[in-house]
Amino acid sequence: MASIQLARTTRGGDGVARADGTRQADEAGSGTLYLVPTPIGNPGDITLRAIEVLRRVGVVASEDTRHTYRLFQSLEIDARLVSYHDHNEESRSRQLLGLLREGTDVALVSDAGTPLVNDPGYRLVAAAVEADVPVRPLPGATASVTALIGSGMPNHQFHYVGFLPRKEAARRAALTALRSTPATLIFFEAPHRIVAMLADLAAVLGDRPAALARNLTKDDEEFLRGRLNELTARLRVEQVVRGQFTVVVAGSPEAHADEDRALAARLTETLVRHGAEARLIREVVREVTGLPRNWVYEQVRLATERSGPLGNS
């Protein structure tokens, strides 16, 4: 692959601009690698800082240069674009690292959203870190978190999965490994596979609560909420399913129950050790965990037997 040629003037950010698009190297002698999010639907998703960085850097590495060129035209960004995708990631990373070492600032973008999130870029970032090249990730649009916060699903703990395997057997095997995960699960899926994917989710994980986010941040953005079987049935009636989907699924109820039982056991032991009355312990544990009355009573009984009798039981 030919080397990357620089052929335009840019404004320097942290250093002095050169006519070839590079800047005077900083004290470390290298440029900076910027990871720049782009819109996931609405063009207004992009940040002012992202626009400033993209206008300034010497090179922008893009998953699809045609797509990025159209975006840059709308934002009046004149940038040197080079391709960076799954098929040239290794060789292009070496070239870009060479430019960074020479003092050129480089920005990495994906077609939509935040770079490296289900997109290429890991090799370049890892190489930059290894070479002590500064890496600056910019905050911005990402479909996974946007869908999560609008889903109504628990968001204190979540597991980003991305795309599942295309073939049913491999897809179900991957889901089986996730079956006991307590965290909310986040997936991406294409419109022509979404119905089959939802059916497999229900078959392997059970009929859990879920939310489908379609065409996030676009004018026709839509959230569909319900249980997996219900959502599968709703999409089956669409003659042609359209849109890009982010799927948010509740975590394992069994795993949450295990966590609640473990918490109840620790809480019971602590209260017994501090001499609390059995009646108060039962009330506190049930209020905190929501576990069944009979189970809580039995735990309190066992704990008090181990530590000696308590009054007012």
UniProtKB/Swiss-Prot annotation:
InterPro entries: 4pyrrol_Mease, 4pyrrol_Methylase_sf, 4pyrrole_Mease_sub1, 4pyrrole_Mease_sub2, rRNA_ssu_MeTfrase_I, SAM_MeTrfase_RsmI_CS
Localization per Swiss-Prot or TrEMBL: Cytoplasm
Major subcellular site: cytoplasm
Region described as Disordered: spans on this chain: 1-23
Keyword list, A-Z: Cytoplasm, Methyltransferase, rRNA processing, S-adenosyl-L-methionine, Transferase
NCBIfam families: 16S rRNA (cytidine(1402)-2'-O)-methyltransferase
Family named by the database record: Belongs to the methyltransferase superfamily. RsmI family.
Protein name as catalogued: Ribosomal RNA small subunit methyltransferase I
Protein's organism: Micromonospora olivasterospora
